[in-house]
Swiss-Prot record:
It comes from Pediococcus pentosaceus (strain ATCC 25745 / CCUG 21536 / LMG 10740 / 183-1w). One of its GO terms (cellular component) is cytosolic large ribosomal subunit. InterPro entries: Ribosomal_protein_uL29, Ribosomal_uL29, Ribosomal_uL29_CS, Ribosomal_uL29_sf. The keyword Acyltransferase does not apply. One of its GO terms (biological process) is translation. PROSITE patterns: RIBOSOMAL_L29. This is Large ribosomal subunit protein uL29. The keyword Transcription regulation does not apply. Coiled coil: none annotated. One of its GO terms (molecular function) is structural constituent of ribosome.
């Protein structure tokens, strides 16, 4: 998800997306530990998406 797409979301949508990504990251870590994860780059992508969402939320908070 790109930063531009994230900035177009409402605050509630961002919070929901962040929760979805955190759940996905949790599952990916389990797959990695059990040796079932094929696409290890997905871990990095999910972490970066969480960071982008947190950054956008903070920017909105500061702009108010």
């Amino acid at each position: 998800m790109k930063a531009k797409e994230i900035n177009e979301l409402t605050t509630d949508e961002m919070i929901n997306k962040e929760k979805e990504y955190k759940d996905e990251l949790f599952n990916l870590r389990f797959q990695l530990a059990t040796g079932q994860l094929e696409n290890t780059a997905r871990l990095k992508a999910v972490r970066k998406n969480i960071a982008r969402i947190k950054t956008a939320l903070r920017q909105q908070e500061l702009n108010k």
